[in-house]
Regions:
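An acidic/histidine-cluster motif and surrounding catalytic segment
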Residues: 2-3, 9-120, 124-273
């Protein structure tokens, strides 16, 4: 694992180095909170840092990875053909940077003494009861590796447990649910994610929820614990026009359709299992 991490760091150079800044009270020994933030968007960190200070919440900054100048043809762990087959388009450099940043955040968490972590992107709005609700979710789902606390969509949610704080936790029969803007992960879950998601074949948010493929125990809340802020309207990855311009069309997209049908079948089985 150390050699693999070194390969990523060597390729991206200084851009992969993490900086961590804490605000508020000392981080909890049980649940830590991390915010991924690009150096060029430090104003976003200042905003969320201000929110955290007002709420008396401890959050730690993890520097995002700017992959805008990375050649994906030479990108470590990026499996181009598999990615195109699964997504119907090639990966965007910003998606690659996002993926690496989340993996780095998980390594930062594992280097701490915390038992679990809330990993967030810098376009969420913090809530005062975030850590308390996360603790209640862990208590209600002790076998969980990952629990998504924010999703773009929650369709055909099958409830597994209801927490003492009223959150409904379960799995969805339809997806992808989208977004890795806020999720809860345990230590064993972080170790599994680093191992199972090392090869990049899907955007990080989609890869994260594929427990049927990775062997992770992944759950989701029915109603978001946090919500996206106004900053989320300014995408740091790409706009819709960019996505449309690189999508495969016609017969070339048949393998993608087949992959998605299989994925839906496996998702349903996983959610009902």
């Amino acid at each position: 694992m150390q050699d693999r991490q070194s390969a990523q760091d060597t390729q991206l150079g200084e851009s992969t180095e993490l900086t961590a800044t804490a605000c508020g009270q000392p981080l909890s020994d049980s649940i830590a909170a991390y915010v991924i933030n690009l150096d060029r968007s430090f104003d976003r960190w200042q905003h969320i840092q201000g929110e955290a200070e007002k709420l008396g919440m401890a959050v730690e900054r993890v520097a995002g990875v700017d992959a805008s100048k990375v050649s994906l043809a030479e990108a470590a762990f990026y499996r181009h053909r598999a990615f195109v087959r699964a997504n119907g388009r090639p990966m965007l450099p910003a998606e690659y940077g996002c993926y690496l940043a989340h993996m780095s955040a998980l390594r930062t968490f594992l280097s701490s003494s915390a038992d679990a972590a809330i990993i967030m992107e810098d376009d969420v709005s913090l809530q005062a009861d975030l850590v308390e609700r996360a603790a209640a979710i862990l208590a209600a789902t002790p076998a969980a590796d990952v629990v998504k606390l924010l999703n773009h969509r929650t369709v055909l949610h099958r409830s597994i447990a209801r927490t003492s704080r009223g959150d409904d936790v379960g799995r969805c029969l339809f997806g992808p649910q989208g977004s890795a803007a806020c999720y809860l992960v345990t230590r064993k879950g972080a170790l599994k994610v680093l191992e199972k998601l090392e090869q990049i074949e899907l955007p990080y948010d989609i890869a994260l929820e594929r427990g049927w493929a990775t062997g992770l125990s992944v759950y989701s809340v029915k109603d978001n614990v946090l919500h996206l802020s106004e900053r989320s309207h300014e995408s740091q990855i790409a706009d819709r026009a960019k996505y449309r311009s690189i999508k495969l069309r016609g017969l070339r997209k048949i393998p993608t359709h087949i992959f998605r049908i299989i994925e839906l079948t496996r998702r349903i089985k996983y959610a009902l299992g």
